[in-house]
Amino acid sequence: MVSKTFFLAAALNVVGTLAQAPTAVLNGNEVISGVLEGKVDTFKGIPFADPPVGDLRFKHPQPFTGSYQGLKANDFSSACMQLDPGNAISLLDKVVGLGKIIPDNLRGPLYDMAQGSVSMNEDCLYLNVFRPAGTKPDAKLPVMVWIYGGAFVFGSSASYPGNGYVKESVEMGQPVVFVSINYRTGPYGFLGGDAITAEGNTNAGLHDQRKGLEWVSDNIANFGGDPDKVMIFGESAGAMSVAHQLVAYGGDNTYNGKQLFHSAILQSGGPLPYFDSTSVGPESAYSRFAQYAGCDASAGDNETLACLRSKSSDVLHSAQNSYDLKDLFGLLPQFLGFGPRPDGNIIPDAAYELYRSGRYAKVPYITGNQEDEGTILAPVAINATTTPHVKKWLKYICSEASDASLDRVLSLYPGSWSEGAPFRTGILNALTPQFKRIAAIFTDLLFQSPRRVMLNATKDVNRWTYLATQLHNLVPFLGTFHGSDLLFQYYVDLGPSSAYRRYFISFANHHDPNVGTNLKQWDMYTDSGKEMLQIHMIGNSMRTDDFRIEGISNFESDVTLFG
């Protein structure tokens, strides 16, 4: 007679087998393990480059030279050194009462997303892989590579778990592998000025992203992914990063003779006409950073950089948070000071010119925005309550623009509440007399004009565009604000969650957002039809991309407004 003990032992053995940690083999024989989370195998905190510390601080990433053997990829790595995104949330709480106006089911996820990058370390070049449970190395699943945003001064891959995308892809019968990459931000990743340019280490953050993509090309097949079917996508500065990866090296996205990526999605971001790495903005940001770190920016290029590399992480973190422009919650001026810059290397020319001259990777893409992108940024100018105040504020952030250019902007964006953002709300939601006007300017300057520049310049590839309006008339003052799409993609399952995920998963699989989604047909953008998908809280519809033509066209043509 078989004992009860035997059956219990057998049952425990089966359970143990089912819950066994997933593994992957790298470099031929180095075994790493991850964690089974429900129906998703997760591998978190995998190094893809050597730690950018000591003499490697501010430099381009170097290939990982360690061993993966025995790595327990159970937890996200620390975020790269950065500003605290909680400062932005705190300001919005103070100015617009964020905690009161955001619906209950979105408030918690918003704060969770902001807190994803609290733990920081300069040793931060790690990535994460999410795949359907039990995926075999020969599965050849499409790969979705996520690049986070954060104004190029904060952000972390830990804020964006890929479980939801993987689960949805399995339910659709179109399984994918999801990868998220850390990259350096602020002065660590986008230090500008003469010194770093002469050293040849500009745009280190873009090189981090590229090094991550090279790792994917070399290794993702070991996790069941297909290196010949990689889609890159990102939001805000992540989308701007995607835009710059498309024009990197004049559109050459190859590595070892193969494309690093084969399609792209840009959410709330596109190419910006940044001035080059030795222009006034990045040079002054470099000088301020050195000054607050206790280094003499006038001592000579090599001496100043050596001084900065000798400082502790705490000293440099304090310096980054001590700028005299920090009264604008450390976002806008530093965003204009730190970011991808033409350097004659990875970015050989201004991004607008690279697109307009056809020097971009010829891959299909999706680009779109939230309707009221600028409302979450407008509080930086909360004290601008009259037209003269607004012009003075514009001159402050658009220092290269002439008075005539600024007057033109003000005439195209009048102070009428009914024409500002949140759009289509009449006289409502005017936090201050100029709030809606400033929010509209931000929306079109930073988001809508780069989107249209891209669409107009890339006539030889298939492209789709969208406008998201899911929070229209639901969130006072903010409307469908910048970043609200992330809540539905990564943190809640309601309303437009399935639209974002299913369209994007289909695009990763087929380079067409319409296959097997059970959603509204999304027509491809054409120059004649200007077809645009509109994403609502419930359902989607097609419309024409024909709003605010004159104002947005002015931003497209006058690059001095970005200086």
UniProtKB/Swiss-Prot annotation:
It is found in: Secreted. It catalyses: a triacylglycerol + H2O = a diacylglycerol + a fatty acid + H(+). Changing residue 520 to Q: In strain: NRCC 205002. Changing residue 303 to D: In strain: NRCC 205002. The active site is at 236 (acyl-ester intermediate), 373 (charge relay system), 482 (charge relay system). Residues 1-19 form the signal peptide. It holds the Pfam family COesterase. One of its GO terms (molecular function) is triacylglycerol lipase activity. This is Lipase 1. It comes from Geotrichum candidum (Oospora lactis). The gene is LIP1.
